């Protein structure tokens, strides 16, 4: 599991919450106090919850599951994209398209169209078209890439989603809950932590804090992948031992045309 210390959280500003007037009652147990009009999050509560969330993501990856990284707010886009790509997981950094999860079949059709356009540009198809048609198709491809590029290799519903801001990504969370997909999410002082399965009390606005969360989530996924059962090695070991087993089996057989008793006497 990726080790993130309380000092690292302090340096990243994880402990700074929202203004006190926006406090959600269910976040009260995770609030240490207030500085001026800003709530201070109790990192002694955050650390164990953070560790639980990272352990869960690692377990999902270890079972060959997929985690969808979601961060469509401006302060989260770069970190989410970079870390999701680093650990080989799908991501959504532009506006969440309604039905991305609940109407996945239709989304896959749009993804197929994106791949078709990408292939057409590389295989010489565009060179056979008139200029204005090429421009139109490139605009279409650009729009699809912006909205679906991060999930174009996601061939099925994810096994979990990792979210930076549950208020900003409320539609994604509703869709995940409807389908029974576990949600790991950073929850600031102005939101209800009971809306997600693995809440991480923390600042959901500061870029350094977002980078810390995303990097830790990617590290957890990579650790899970590294701990996957190596099925290939097991099969190779079985294959290597197979000839010996076969040899013993052949030795046990009597020679053709002889009775078993004669073979035993020899």
Swiss-Prot record:
This is Small ribosomal subunit protein uS2. The keyword Ribonucleoprotein applies. CDD domains: RPS2 (cd01425). SUPFAM superfamilies: Ribosomal protein S2. Keywords: Ribonucleoprotein, Ribosomal protein. Belongs to the universal ribosomal protein uS2 family. Residues 248-258 have a biased composition (Basic residues). Residues 238-266 are annotated as: Disordered. One of its GO terms (molecular function) is structural constituent of ribosome. It comes from Xylella fastidiosa (strain M12). GO terms for cellular component: cytosolic small ribosomal subunit.
């Amino acid at each position: 599991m990726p080790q993130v210390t309380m000092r690292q959280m302090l340096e990243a500003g994880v402990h700074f919450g929202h203004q006190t007037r926006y406090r959600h009652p269910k976040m009260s147990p995770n609030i240490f106090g207030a500085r001026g009009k800003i709530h201070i999050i109790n990192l002694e509560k955050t650390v164990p919850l953070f560790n639980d969330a990272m352990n869960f993501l690692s377990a999902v990856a270890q079972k060959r599951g997929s985690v969808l990284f979601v961060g469509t707010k401006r302060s989260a886009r770069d970190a989410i994209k970079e870390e999701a790509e680093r650990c080989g997981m799908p991501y959504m950094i532009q506006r969440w398209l309604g039905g991305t999860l609940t109407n996945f079949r239709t989304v896959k059709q749009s993804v197929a169209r994106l791949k078709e356009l990408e292939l057409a540009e590389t295989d010489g198809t565009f060179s056979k078209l008139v200029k204005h048609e090429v421009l139109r198709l490139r605009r279409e491809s650009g729009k699809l890439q912006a909205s679906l590029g991060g999930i174009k290799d996601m061939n099925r519903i994810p096994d979990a989603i990792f979210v930076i801001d549950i208020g900003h990504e409320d539609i994604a969370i509703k869709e995940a809950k409807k389908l029974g997909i576990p949600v790991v999410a950073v929850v600031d002082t102005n939101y209800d932590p009971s809306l997600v399965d693995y809440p991480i009390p923390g600042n959901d606005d500061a870029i350094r804090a977002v980078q810390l969360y995303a990097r830790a989530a990617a590290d957890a996924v990579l650790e899970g992948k590294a701990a996957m059962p190596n099925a290939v090695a097991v099969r190779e070991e079985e294959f290597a031992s197979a000839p010996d087993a076969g040899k013993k089996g052949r030795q046990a057989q009597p020679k053709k045309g002889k009775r078993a008793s004669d073979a035993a006497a020899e």
